Each structure stands twice: as C-alpha cells, then as structure tokens.
Amino acid sequence: MATYEGKVFTEEQEALVVKSWTVMKKKTAELGLKFFLKIFEIAPSAKKLFSFLRDSNVPLEQNTKLKPHAMSVFVMTCESAVQLRKAGKVTVRESNLKKLGATHFKYGVVDEHFEVTKFALLETIKEAVPDMWSDEMKNAWGEAYDRLVAAIKIEMKACSQAA
C-alpha cells in the first residue's frame, strides 16, 4: 500500500479514482480546458504564470496553446492518481517530476496556487462524474493530488537550494 505522512492510499480509494478516470478519459481535452478555466475564474492573476497567456487578447477558450497544455496537465494529474497505489509513490516520470519542480519554482508557484488548483480539479471531476461523486471519491482524489503536489514541492525545494 502507498503510504504518505502516515496515511495509506487504500484499495477503495484507488478503485474510486480508477472508476472515475475511466469515464473522464474519453473527454480529456474538454475536461482539461474546464479545469484551467476554473483555475482562472477563481484566481485570474494565475494567468500571469503562463507566458502564452500574459500578452494574449484571445479569449481563454480559444487560446490554441492553453488547450493542449490544459489537457496535458489534466491527464498527467489523473494518471498519477491512478498509478499511486500500484506504484506506492507518485509515478510521474522522474525527469518530468524534476522538470515540474523546476518550472513551478521558476514561475513562482506558491501554496495558494496549489490549493486553487486542487479545488478546481475536484470541481471538474465532480461535474464530470456527478452520478459517481461522493465524499469518499472527493477524499481519494484529494489525497492523490496532495501526494503529487508534495512530490513537486520536493523538487521545487531542490531548485531553491541549488539557486
């Protein structure tokens, strides 16, 4: 079982994550964009963190660079959650994890950004699978997200110490 700060990512949590991801996988482009639109709705200033959005006057929904980025982040986050228990740890490829840490450090991502992103992720999943949604599913996805963020923060800290 995957453990993290004394918590265990259970078989039941894994089943909830896998079941919902199986449904969501069919709509990753749409859900990824919804996910990011929620982030920017909650925290409009987060747009400044993305170079391709800073000077753009194009509506977010039509930004050709946002859509693929949003889908990529959504898929990576969900796949990481699905693999968590099986691997016993966050399974973003090591080189990607280092890159994620470096990128998040470079652009000045802080705890509040991760919290907004978590809220947006959970809301996106809730809307994507309303018939499956429960407190247990919310907790399972929340736990998986928290572990991914913890792994990214470790890499961010390594970057800050190297700077």
From Swiss-Prot:
Residues at which heme b binds: 51, 65, 69, 99, 103-104
Motif (Homodimerization): 41-45, 111-123
Subcellular location: Cytoplasm; Nucleus
GO molecular function: heme binding; metal ion binding; oxidoreductase activity; oxygen binding
Signal sequence annotation: none
Highest rank taxon of the organism: Eukaryota
GO cellular component, one term: cytoplasm
One Pfam family per UniProt: Globin
Cofactor(s) for this UniProt protein: heme b
EC number: 1.7.2.-
Keywords: Cytoplasm, Heme, Iron, Metal-binding, Nucleus, Oxidoreductase
CDD domains with a match to the protein in the record: class1_nsHb-like
Cofactor note as given: Binds 1 heme group per subunit.
Site (Homodimerization) residue list: 138
Residue pairs linked by disulfide bridges in the UniProt entry: none
Database matches in Gene3D superfamilies: Globins
Ranges where the Globin domain occurs: 8-157
Catalytic activity field: Fe(III)-heme b-[protein] + nitric oxide + H2O = Fe(II)-heme b-[protein] + nitrite + 2 H(+)
Function per UniProt: Phytoglobin that reduces nitrite to nitric oxide (NO) under anoxic conditions (e.g. during flooding or in waterlogged soil). May not function as an oxygen storage or transport protein. Has an unusually high affinity for O(2) through an hexacoordinate heme iron because of a very low dissociation constant.
Quaternary structure, from the entry: Homodimer.
Family: Belongs to the plant globin family.
Protein name: Anaerobic nitrite reductase HB1
